[in-house]
Every structure is written in structure tokens, then in C-alpha cells.
Amino acid sequence: SKSTFADRSYVILATPNHGRVNALAERLEAQGIEMYTNTAPLKVASATTQLGAQEKGVVIPKGSLIIPNRQPDAPLIAAIMEFDANVRESVLVEERQRVLRDGSSLMYDTTAWNFSMMYGLPAVTVPQHLDKGLKPWQPATPVIDVKPDAIAWTVDGDDDRSVAFAARLMERDIQVRVIDKATVLSGQSLSRGSVFVTAMDNPHTDNLPMLIAAEAENLTLSVKSIDSGFGAGDLPDWGGAHFRLLSRPQIAILSQAGFSSYDVGSTWWAIDTHLGIRHSQLDAAYLSRADLRRYSTIVIPNGYRPLGGSELEALRGWVRQGGTLIAHDNSAANLAREGGIGSVRTIGDALDDAQDYDIALQRELLATSEELDMAAVGTHRLNPAIAYPWDQGSSPLSAEELKRRDTWQSRFMPSGAMVAGRVDPLHWMSFGTGNMLPLLYSEQPAFMTKDRQQSIVRVGIHEPDPTAEQAETINWSTTPRGKALRVRMSGLLWPEAASRIANSAYVTRERIGKGQVILFSGQPNFRGSTRGVGRVWLNALIYGPGLGTSPKIDL
């Protein structure tokens, strides 16, 4: 009770993503770590958030996963659960000296590693030993309610296993839909991203309820039966545009020479483990001569060489005909260049048009604002004093200065730090994610988007800051008045690197012809541990052919 670990508890806040919490609990249990849950909301005097903020009077919701640090493996628990481990000043001084002298580093591995951020689960650290009103933690018991006479059956889209459920049913040639807006049917709440299977879509499928129940049992996933398709009030009804039909993905991974065996392996593992469906591997050496028509989705893992002209031309034509191309890390950077595929660019290639990218960023931010001057909207007199996003009082930097800064700041890129990602809450690729997503960031490309290119995840979370009386210029972007930007969550992230990647895009999507190109700045399945951003990747892989491309009609 007198150790440095005695008065500390780690809390994974209650979430409907039972599959992900169960996966974390299994790993903790394998180490003999004791876990508990609260049977009622629990108020604590203070807690530290994953963004490092100290909050007072925090209420821990019922059903949270609580891990007291006061138990036999206390040092291990702290090592794998604490949000932000300190690095000695002497180490930081030597690290910075090395970076500036010759670009070398003391850091041989990622400097940020804790379970809650890797798994993308919201959590807090409570500076006290929690033991009252708790009981041993048990995984949620699935309720498989499959009525044979129901008109439809659904699983919760907040749970990662819902993606596997959809993928496996489509492997059986069952028609599957996904809901892109939350609704209530038959008194049952259906979240965004919920998988929806109807009897009407599958009139010739024998034993449909039995197949649904069997797959749910395999995944230990709850299923709800729906008896009425009328949404409560103005909520979506079955038959409306929000119940979107999926297409069965036919997946290939580029591999062999020129690709990272780590990323190829973790991509392969993610498909096998999280989805359990078939896929193919294509030798990149034969890409320009391969028949790509059999695939609807191609994944390009992190690679060490850019694709050649004939290879790019083959992929470009395939995308235009309706393919979904997903690329990681350096492979994504090789596509995001002049002569690549699409119009997304890396920061270094976009600074000549910095103001255009900043205006696109401001439009995104304004699109989420709920502030409105009703008097200005309702006036009959023309008001010439219109506020424009490029006229906030801050002075933009010249292209020359931006390039000079980018060259300098790129020296300080991390070896593996956690940064805060803000998520587009309306995009189909963000099913099952919150508004903030921890991102593992290293020496990797930072992307820029504008016009019709979409940023599903950007770096940095805006928070209210009453002291920020003026807009602030951060390299190419502008932070609005009254806002502050939080970037670092955990690990070593030099201020120069934080400024460089602030507001850049981590996940992008661009429509090209009938198909789409989806770029991930990093490796979304890093060592099989980044479950948060991994969910975005699973959405792209399984839902992309149905939600992001034009349907193919075979006559």
C-alpha cells in the first residue's frame, strides 16, 4: 500500500464495442492480471484523460473495465497501461543532439506503447485504489435473438465483430446491408454501421435464420430480430437510402519482393484473424500482366520501391472500372505524387498551394460548427462584412518559408509516438469509432487533401481555449480563434514534428472513375495491435466495394 503503484487504477470506459474490450481482457487475463467492473456509475474526485488533461468529478459509467495497479504484477501493469511514460532528460538531450548532428537516434522502437491507445479504447487513469462497489469482470454474454418469422436481423455496428459477420455472410452469397445513420426499429436501437440482413433481400436462401444464428455463435456476437421497418419519428425506415446494400469483396494483397514482410504479414494476419475470409496474394512482379478483374479490392502494404509505369497504369485502369485500392505508408506516398494515382499529395509536394489546403481544412471545421448568427441570416439588408475562412487575422507563411520549415521539421519525425486523430463522424469508414482515435505515428508520409478528396482522419483534436483571442498560423494551416490543438498523446514527439503533422490527413479517400483510392499514412495493422485504426481499415476493406464504388451490372 506504500508503493508508487498503490494508489492508481486504470479504467477502460464502458463501450458497446464488446469484441474489442474482450480481446484486451483476454490478454490481461493471460498475464494473471485481476480485472473488475462497477455495477453502478462511480464518481471519482479526479482522473487523467488520454490527452493528459486533469478532470475533476469524473463519473465512471457502469460496466467499465477497472484494473487496480495495487496487485502482484504492479510494475507490469503500469508498463502496459500507463498513458505517458516519462523519458529521462539526459536521454532526451542525447537523442536531440544525435538527430541534429547526423540524423541518428537512440530510439530503436516505438516510444509509445499502452493497451488502451493501441486498442483505440477510451480510458482514464484514476489516482486512487478503486475497490468499492466492484465485482470481478466477466465478458458480456451475447444474446442471439433470431426469430424465424422476423423481417430482418441486425448486429451492432459499434462492435468490431460486426464487420466479420457481414463479410462471412457475403462469402455465403447472402445479401447484406449496413445502416449509415442510427435509428430505432421495433423498439431496438441500431447504431451507425449496424449490419442488417433482410428476408426480402434473400428470398432464395434456405435456412437464412439458421445461417445468421450460426455465424453469430461463431463470433459470440449478439443478434436482434426486427419485426417492423418503421423508424421512430424522423429516423430512417427500412427501404430508405440509409440502408445501403454491400458488395462481396474479393481481396488481393500485393506481396513478395519490394514490400515490408512485417506489413504484409500483419495485413494477412488481420484478414485471417479478424475476418476469417478468403483472400489472394499477388506477386507484384507480375502485376502489369495479371488479370485484375477478379478482384474488387487490392491492398498495397508498405513498400520499399515505387511501382513502375506499367504497374501504375494497370492499377489506374482497374480503379477507374470500380476497384478499391488501399495503400499503406510508403506505398501510399508513392501513389500520392505527380504521376501516381489520384490527387492526394504529401506535405512536401503541396506547399505551393498551401492556402487552398487551409481553406479546405477550414471548410471541414466550419461544417461541424453549431454556431449560427440568426440575426444575420434573417436580415433583409445586405451585410458586406462577411467572414471568410482565409481572413481570420493570422498571416499565412510564404511557400518558401513553408518549405524551409518542412525541411527542418522533417528531421524530428518520431520513431513511434501516439498522436490524437480527429475522425469524420459521418463517413462510412468511421463506423465503430469515436470522435477521437489514437494514431501510432513514426517517420511516415503526412497527406494533404482538398476539393473532392476526403480526410476521414486528421491529426489533432481541437479544444475550446478562451485565451486564444486570435487565430494562429501553424505552418500551412490555421487554428481558429478560441481553439487550441492537442496533438501528442504518448511517447516522444518533438514540437517540430508535432507542428509538421498537425492537421495533416492520416486516412484519405478519393473517388476515381467508378472506383476509389484509400490511403493510410501509417501501417493500420502494426504488429496486429492497433485495433482502433485497424477498424477503419476493416471498414475500407469490407464495406468499400459496396459503399464507395459504383455498382457493377453483369448481364
Predicted regions and their residues:
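Intrinsic-disorder/low-complexity accessory segments
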Residues: S1-L555
